């Protein structure tokens, strides 16, 4: 992975902090010997003229899983919409992150490729209000955990029914105009409360989950224009 990323790290356009290129890892607590892997990558980065790497993790479940060492990372991403849902639902912040972690391991060991939840299928597509989600996102205040600084995350939309059909869920009332309004407020919050000038956006091209900034036939470049305007 490091050797693949190295040409990008050396590109002058690649984001870096104090001569440490950014390296984002999704659900790092699933990686065996994570500490040794990051130590090796840091060593390799220094051998290639950098002062190390800036490590960032992203995963709602990872954020609330206390069983792994977040101190290996410089930043964590408030990976919305999952993060805000777990933040305001204390019941899901206990066993759920660990279940997410170990259920993947169990499925891998047993060779299970799909999991079926008949109850969810019978309930049909879930619907959530876009405005309500954003109001909660704007209430978030970063908490430094193990020295890890948090990065806020904006959400364009969510609809994972293309992937999960009846078992999926989607936001209602999402528009580019609302996204622009809420994104502007998130920028203000970032300046006031967060120890970073970065904001992550869900997402660039998660078409199967309804979160994307890429232009489409319905809204054209409206979401990209919203960010540009802010």
Q: Model-flagged regions — what are they?
A:
Residues 1-7, 37, 130, 167-182:
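Alpha-helical scaffold elements lining the catalytic groove of polysaccharide deacetylases
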Residues 2-8, 12, 28-47, 53-56, ...:
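Extracellular zinc-dependent metalloprotease catalytic-domain scaffold
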Residues 2-31, 197-206:
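Active-site groove signature of glycoside hydrolases
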Residues 20-22, 50-53, 146-149, 194-199:
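Loop/turn elements at helix/coil->beta-strand transitions in domains of secreted/extracellular proteins
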Residues 21-32, 119-132, 167-177, 209-216:
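The substrate-binding groove and active-site-proximal loops of carbohydrate-active enzymes
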Residues 40-173:
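Aromatic-lined glycan-binding groove of carbohydrate-active enzymes
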Residues 174-215:
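Substrate-binding cleft of secreted/luminal carbohydrate-active enzymes
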Residues 224-230:
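Carbohydrate-binding surfaces of carbohydrate-active enzymes
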């Amino acid at each position: 992975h490091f050797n693949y990323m190295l040409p990008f790290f050396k590109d002058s356009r690649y984001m870096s902090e104090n001569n440490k290129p950014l390296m984002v890892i999704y659900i790092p607590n699933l990686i065996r010997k994570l500490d040794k892997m990051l130590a090796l990558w840091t060593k390799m980065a220094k051998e290639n003229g950098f002062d190390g790497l800036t490590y960032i993790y992203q995963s709602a479940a990872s954020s609330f899983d206390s069983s792994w060492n977040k101190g290996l990372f410089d930043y964590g991403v408030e990976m919305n919409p999952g993060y805000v849902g777990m933040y305001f639902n204390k019941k899901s912040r206990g066993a759920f992150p660990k279940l997410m972690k170990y259920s993947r391991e169990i499925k891998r060991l047993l060779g299970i490729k799909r999991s079926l939840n008949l109850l969810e299928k019978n309930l049909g597509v879930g619907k959530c209000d876009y405005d309500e989600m954003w109001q909660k996102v704007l209430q978030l205040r970063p908490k430094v955990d193990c020295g890890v600084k948090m990065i806020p995350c904006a959400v364009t939309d969510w609809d994972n029914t293309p992937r999960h059909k009846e078992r999926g869920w989607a936001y209602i009332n999402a528009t580019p105009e609302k996204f622009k309004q809420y994104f502007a407020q998130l920028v203000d919050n970032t300046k006031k409360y967060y120890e970073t000038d970065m904001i992550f956006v869900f997402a660039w091209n998660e078409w199967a989950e309804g979160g994307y900034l890429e232009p489409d036939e319905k809204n054209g470049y409206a979401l990209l224009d919203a960010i540009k305007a802010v």
